[in-house]
């Protein structure tokens, strides 16, 4: 049975772990980067079409107050890049996504 829209499942915990890890190492978190890490480290969302699912999860996490989004100008004529940061509420869930931090 599918989870209710906006619930926090394993995919969202993986995304929180990625953003937390990126912040800890001084890296930026943006949709494409998060999707790439999901593919290479967690071996999920392997198809290009799955990128849109990552953005849906990011939107859910933002609406839940677990991450924030800010815009950063892209290089040259590229569009602005949406950067994601984990909030204090998101950090409080570290015990739920800690197992994924160990993979990263």
Stretch-by-stretch model annotation:
Residues 71-82:
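Short, Lys/Arg-rich nucleic-acid/phosphate-binding segment
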Residues 1-29:
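Short alpha-helical segments that sit at the start of domains
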Residues 54-64:
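Basic amphipathic alpha-helical segments that dock to polyanions
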């Amino acid at each position: 049975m599918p989870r209710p829209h906006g619930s926090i499942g394993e995919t969202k915990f993986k995304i929180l772990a990625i953003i937390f890890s990126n912040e800890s190492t001084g890296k930026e978190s943006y949709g494409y980067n998060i999707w790439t890490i999901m593919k290479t480290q967690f071996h999920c969302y392997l198809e290009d079409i799955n990128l849109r699912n990552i953005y849906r999860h990011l939107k859910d996490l933002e609406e839940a107050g677990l991450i924030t989004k800010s815009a950063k100008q892209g290089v040259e004529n590229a569009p602005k890049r949406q950067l994601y940061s984990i909030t204090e509420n998101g950090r409080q869930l570290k015990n739920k996504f800690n197992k994924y931090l160990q993979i990263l």
